[in-house]
């Protein structure tokens, strides 16, 4: 095997993303190993249906606007009224379900009175259904998330006015 053949073999290794090759033929041995740099995890791809309910707060500028400033008109700022009540938050990352099954009625709805031990929803994490209890007594004022939406640890699920 001459130098040209070895160079072609190295190019083929790069094209095919091979890390190592060993050749033994007629008393000739050749072993090539590529240093691929640090071990970087492959990108993770998510099913877009999981994020269908999310909206993007700020638009991503297109290639045409990269050199130009983005001008945004600002109207009158509305006074934010303080929100009355406390919040029930998600104790873990998962998927929010407001009912035990699709055919069942919701655990709670606005206007319902709950105690500390009342189950208000289920958060599914890794195929395990975890019941979320109110943790406080009061009246449900608002359901802040839609059935089937993903939730993060600490996401606000319900607004409660303590009794």
Swiss-Prot record:
Homodimer. Pfam families: Biotin_lipoyl. The gene is accB. Keywords: Biotin, Fatty acid biosynthesis, Fatty acid metabolism, Lipid biosynthesis, Lipid metabolism. One of its GO terms (molecular function) is acetyl-CoA carboxylase activity. One of its GO terms (cellular component) is acetyl-CoA carboxylase complex. Residues 85-161 form the Biotinyl-binding domain. One of its GO terms (biological process) is fatty acid biosynthetic process. Pathway: Lipid metabolism; fatty acid biosynthesis. The keyword Lipid metabolism applies. InterPro entries: AcCoA_biotinCC, Biotin_BS, Biotin_Carboxyl_Carrier/Decarb, Biotin_lipoyl, Single_hybrid_motif. This protein is a component of the acetyl coenzyme A carboxylase complex; first, biotin carboxylase catalyzes the carboxylation of the carrier protein and then the transcarboxylase transfers the carboxyl group to form malonyl-CoA. The modification N6-biotinyllysine is found at residue 127. Disulfide bonds: none annotated. This is Biotin carboxyl carrier protein of acetyl-CoA carboxylase. The keyword Lipid metabolism applies.
């Amino acid at each position: 095997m001459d130098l040209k053949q070895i160079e072609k073999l190295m190019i083929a290794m790069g094209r095919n993303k091979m890390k190592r090759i060993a050749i033994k033929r007629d008393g000739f041995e050749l072993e090539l190993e590529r240093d691929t740099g640090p071990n970087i995890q492959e990108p993770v791809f998510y099913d877009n249906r999981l994020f269908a309910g999310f909206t993007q707060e700020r638009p991503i500028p297109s290639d045409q606007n990269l050199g130009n400033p983005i001008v945004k008109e600002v109207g009158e700022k509305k006074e934010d009224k303080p929100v009355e009540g406390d919040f029930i938050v998600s104790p873990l990352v998962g998927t929010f379900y407001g009912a035990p099954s699709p055919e069942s009625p919701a655990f709670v709805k606005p206007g319902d009175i709950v105690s500390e031990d009342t189950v208000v929803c289920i958060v599914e994490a890794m195929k395990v259904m975890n019941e979320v209890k109110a943790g406080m007594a009061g009246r449900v004022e608002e359901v802040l998330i839609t059935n089937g939406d993903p939730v993060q640890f600490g996401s606000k699920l319900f607004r409660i006015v303590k009794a």
